[in-house]
Curated annotation (Swiss-Prot):
Residues 71-106 are annotated as: Framework-3. Residues 20-41 are annotated as: Framework-1. Residues 1-20 form the signal peptide. Disulfide bonds join 41-106. InterPro entries: Ig-like_dom, Ig-like_dom_sf, Ig-like_fold, Ig_sub, Ig_V-set, IgV_Light_Chain. Residues 107-115 are annotated as: Complementarity-determining-3. The gene is IGLV3-22. This is Immunoglobulin lambda variable 3-22.
Length: 115
């Protein structure tokens, strides 16, 4: 049975008096259980600010998975990892389980101006 995750096209905008930030993700990533999933997100703001990753399962609120580029939130399995290089951040899920099926969102911005 194939495992698929649907990533809604993400367009996060912050409009202020000084700047406008935009982050983009691919629409979807599909892998089989046991494989490695890599989900990328890109945007100019990532070169200057941390990236956070959220997981949202159907009917549930989003939950923080990775913060400050690569820090795992307490209780998140070690299979989840994050990295950022230049203007691209990547969420990697190793040894994917069917329970990992969800929407994943990247967010970034400084403390005063999140995007």
């Amino acid at each position: 049975m194939a495992w698929a995750t649907l990533l809604l096209p993400l367009l996060n905008l912050y409009t202020g008096s000084v700047a406008s930030y935009e982050l983009t993700q691919l629409p979807s990533v599909s892998v089989s259980p046991g494989q490695t999933a890599r989900i990328t997100c890109s945007g100019d703001v990532l070169g200057e600010n941390y990236a956070d990753w959220y997981q949202q399962k159907p009917g549930q609120a989003p939950e923080l998975v990775i913060y400050e580029d690569s820090e795992r939130y307490p209780g998140i399995p070690e299979r989840f990892s994050g990295s950022t290089s230049g203007n691209t951040t990547t969420l990697t899920i190793s040894r994917v389980l069917t329970e990992d099926e969800a929407d994943y969102y990247c967010l970034s911005g400084d403390e005063d101006n999140p995007s």
